[in-house]
Amino acid sequence: QETSAKLADTEETLQETSAKLADTEETLQETSAKLADTEETLQETSAKLADTEETLSAEIASLAEQHGVAQTLCEQQGAYMNQLLTYVRAAYNVTLDGMTEVQATAVADILRQCDYALRSVAQAASDEVEHVKEMYNMVDGNYKETAARFDILRRILGKIDQDVKEASVEIDAPERRQTCSLHPTPRRLGDVSNRENSIENKTRSASRLSGRLF
């Protein structure tokens, strides 16, 4: 009776454990489904990021080209203005004695203003290129961080799945032992027949011995 009670308690414990395991498997399936949805979303995001990366790369290349053109133009204009200023100064020094210095100063101011304007345009183009590069680096960093987080989540779910499988194996072993104890192996008929023959022989021997004594 004590063994039956212990077996009943063990069976109840196994049933509770099996129910918890079923709940854990259900939770794991739900989590796996959510992970699949998240992975699909991540793939879509990756595709969008790839498109964004391609677009940003094209914009960076275009802006870099424009910046190079603007810088080259600025250098050419600066060299041309320096040559023009030198020529004007030389020409006015030769032809107009009294007005040369005033006019040369005015022309120099105009040339400096033009040079400043060209340099400002070139600097603005360079700043825009740097801004686009920063945006690209930020998007790329966010993508890599998100991918790393999902990789950690996949590892955690894999560990949970392994623990559930190991728990299933540990639960199945006591259930098999309990089934064997509840259904013992029946004795062979030969064992019973041998026991009956032995008892019959002993009875006959006792009868013959009593006959001799009396």
Curated annotation (Swiss-Prot):
Keywords from the UniProt entry = Membrane, Repeat
Bias kind Basic and acidic residues: ranges = 188-203
Q: A Gene Ontology CC term for this entry?
A: membrane
The annotated region (Disordered) lies at 1-31, 180-214
Q: What is this protein called?
A: Membrane antigen containing repeating peptides
Q: Where is this region: 4 X 14 AA tandem repeats?
A: 1-56
Question: Is Membrane one of the keywords?
Answer: yes
Q: Which domain of life is it from?
A: Eukaryota
Spans of sequence repeats, please give. 1-14, 15-28, 29-42, 43-56
Asked if Repeat is a keyword of the record, the answer is yes
Q: Enumerate the subcellular locations listed in this protein's record, separating them with semicolons.
A: Membrane
